[in-house]
Amino acid sequence: MNLKVTTHMVDLPEIPHHNLVGLGVVALAKGDTERFQAIMAAGTHHYGEGLMVVGDSISRHWLAACANPYAVEIAEIAAVAGMPGSFLMNLSYEWACTTSVTADPSGSGNRLLRTLDWPLQGLGRNVVVATMEGAAGVYENVTWPGFAGVVTAMAPGRFSAAINQPPMRKWSPSFWLDWGINRCRLWRRRALPPVHVLRQVFDTCRTYREAKKVLSETPLAMPAFFTLSGIEPREGCVIEREEDATHVREAPASVANHWVAAHIPGRCRGIDSLGRFTLMESLGEGVLDDFSWVRSPILNSTTRLAVVAN
């Protein structure tokens, strides 16, 4: 399996590649302090100092109440940061993405195409690829210093996967009332966030079939869309997840930031989710082995990252 990553369709510096085998994600925050501090500064600028402090405290207590397996790592990352925000940033879930999984035109396995959009400035400039290792083997994690979860990754000889965010559930005419209701629902749950479930999958699942089972059946703290791509031509799917319910679409399939397999009222995420989805669906298996597919509306003002994984 191969992994290609770019931060935009222009000439940019090469993305750093860190070997964290035997070291862990805390070592990345310690070893790449320039990028780590830049991301923390961007978070403070985006959320504001007050929300970073309050959100950090709430996030820390919730992780402790859930007995989250990565809470200790995040606490160590927070100590490295020396400022509030690491707990909040690790639970931030505001990105918009476009992803697809189809048979690779080379005839070898499946191919995952993926962009990540986020209003937080600096994510593209500060992205890294980290080689990590769990019980099931090594994997390449497209990540940022200070982040303990997995959003996009590829495990050679096993599978690749990515997370998209569903719409915010709509309960009322008011955006802020809906935001509050959804946050209250989250704080009452004692399940793992999707980014931590995906990390566990890369750490422990040895096959596409195992990964699909875990992503389909594990209770979640909040809804998520998982795209999973294996090494065989028929190993590909989009898993649309509610907290305790699952809707699977087999490959070829695409996903942006709206429900396709389920009909759940929600508030839109990102720029032109339907347009991004429609373009990705139309591309199918005809995409060249490059980033020419990253064009409007898949490419927009908040696009920070593009990935091709086979």
Describe these PLM feature segments:
Residues 1-105, 202-310:
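C-terminus-biased signal that marks the final domain/tail of proteins
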